[in-house]
From Swiss-Prot:
The keyword Coiled coil applies. This is Uncharacterized protein L385. Residues 1-17 have a biased composition (Basic and acidic residues). Residues 1-24 are annotated as: Disordered. Residues 52-115 form a coiled coil. Keywords: Coiled coil.
Amino acid sequence: MNKSESENDSEYHKEYSESSDPEDTSFISLNKEIQNIRYIISDIKSQTVDVIQNLNNNVKEYNAFIHKFQNEYKTDKISVNSSVCHLESRVHILEHEIKSIKQDNQMLFEKMRDMLTDNSRLFGIIFDILKDLETNPGNKK
């Protein structure tokens, strides 16, 4: 209710408050009720504005939290991706080293087998020479 309306109502109210007519009294009472209702509506509007402002502030705070968590998530995701890349390259290096060690082991195994074969052949020759020496002690080569 604006100022001019309240001035008009109060003048009107004064004019009829002096009257003793029951209709005038009920009209005055009705005007008081209307003023009370206007006050209540004004109060509700004020409270509604306060509630809306509080809600807007809460939404802003929640948006700030969400933005903060999104940034932290992005940072963590980048960190995790970096760690995964580092670990993948370490795994690749280890796989290469394992493959190299397997190849070296295979070469060593083949070399040992060849050496055992050569040793067996040489021991065979030595035993043949010793056998010859036992059977022919005077026949030295």
